């Protein structure tokens, strides 16, 4: 904003370096100049620069990395165990692809007891023992 032609300053102040400056009411001001609409070339450049900024951000870099990994067709392994300690055994093993489609799922019969906290989360039935399952997975 700039003072309108003929507008008088409400107050004057002096800078420590010797200059004098006026202070105007906002109502007495007009825009610096009319803003012209962007050209097609400016719009394309703005879009391109915005995309480049997003891709250079941390989130953009991780998104590109995830996209690269997902393009390889990964398979995700999920397990449920009898507990969280070092002696815990697997109760359930499942494999899903990147689209979330179930590839393999089975339950195992552990040779150790199930931690009560783990039992509260999992539904336990009579599943296969691991040696039988290892043959099925191979």
UniProtKB/Swiss-Prot annotation:
Sample GO molecular function, one term: nucleic acid binding
Highest taxon in the source lineage: Bacteria
Matches recorded under InterPro entries: RNaseH-like_sf, RNaseH_sf
Alphabetical UniProt keywords: Plasmid
Family in the record: To phage 186 CP81.
Record-given protein name: Uncharacterized protein pSLT049
């Amino acid at each position: 904003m700039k003072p309108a032609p003929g507008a008088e300053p409400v107050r004057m102040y002096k800078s420590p370096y010797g200059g004098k400056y006026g202070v105007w009411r906002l109502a007495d001001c007009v825009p610096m100049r009319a803003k012209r609409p962007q050209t097609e070339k400016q719009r394309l450049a703005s879009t391109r620069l915005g995309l480049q900024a997003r891709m250079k951000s941390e989130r953009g870099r991780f998104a590109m990395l995830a996209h690269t990994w997902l393009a390889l067709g990964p398979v995700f392994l999920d397990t449920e165990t009898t507990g969280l300690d070092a002696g815990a055994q697997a109760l359930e093993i499942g494999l899903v692809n990147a689209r979330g489609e179930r590839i393999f799922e089975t339950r195992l019969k552990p040779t150790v007891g199930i931690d009560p906290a783990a039992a509260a989360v999992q539904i336990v039935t009579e599943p296969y023992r691991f040696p039988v399952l290892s043959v099925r997975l191979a």
